[in-house]
């Protein structure tokens, strides 16, 4: 099949899953065409079965803002005709499903172009922030030829808000060949020269990820007398706040802010416990990646995370913002290597 895939090319779960899905489809003999404003984060290699089509933005004095939705629809339509696409798979209803539906309708009747939309959760939060987006978001979902959600939580939330339930749950995934615990002795030595256990946080450092809470948790762990270090992987608007809080608490020298990294699996393999204290997660891909690397997870009991992390078996769940309990759970895992290894193996 010739498959068009559109994702946000940013450092986030949807772009990662979309990229990995495309690569796995290509490995099975399909030809995948990524249609986006930039090369997706995890799409590091292009070949005859994995191709990239950049959406070109038009600068026109009449438009105050560049019309990305229309530009994307135009590129989708063009690629569909030139490459004889069999379907479009878009991640997020807004704006991607709207663009895909426009492209599909523009090609009728000479070409049939089914549209599959995968919901990742931002569509729900967008409507929650501004109800005026509800009709157009619902239109993008209802008019899709197929709709999937990444968790049962998200399916139920979509049903409640949009009164639409023809949704198939297909959880996010990681490739076991790529995500497994590796021997990264040199990296671990760099991150922890004195051999202390390592807490790690991986995200895009948006407020919803609560990276400052990771610093608060770590400070409480140190106060309990546990010798450890904190590794913060990623970048975003909250990074400066997290660094500032670490300095205020006098623990900055025990933290490593390493920014965006191309090989997350190396950092997960080097560390011992993942912190994911998010306000909201429709799934929690970082948790799944950590678990694949035998790293137990300390996370919020929110959204789809309980479908990923089994409390007391593969990690510990707590109410959002309960940094005291998260610190207790983290300290317990850091000092009990046997428990940590058992949980990691179950994960």
Task: Provide a role label for each language-model segment.
Residues 193-218:
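Conserved donor-binding/catalytic core segment of Leloir-type glycosyltransferases
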Residues 153, 173:
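Carbohydrate-associated surface elements
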Residues 243-259:
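Nucleotide-activated donor-binding/catalytic signature segment of Leloir-type glycosyltransferases, i.e.
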Residues 179-193:
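A short helix/loop element that forms part of the nucleotide-sugar donor recognition site in Leloir-type
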Residues 325, 332, 339-347:
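A short, well-ordered alpha-helix in the C-terminal region of glycosyltransferases
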Residues 7-11, 23-70:
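N-terminal strand-loop element at the rim of the active site
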Residues 296-299, 309:
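Short hydrophobic beta-strand element within catalytic cores of glycosyltransferases
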Residues 260, 279:
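Aromatic "clamp/platform" in nucleotide-sugar-dependent glycosyltransferases that forms part
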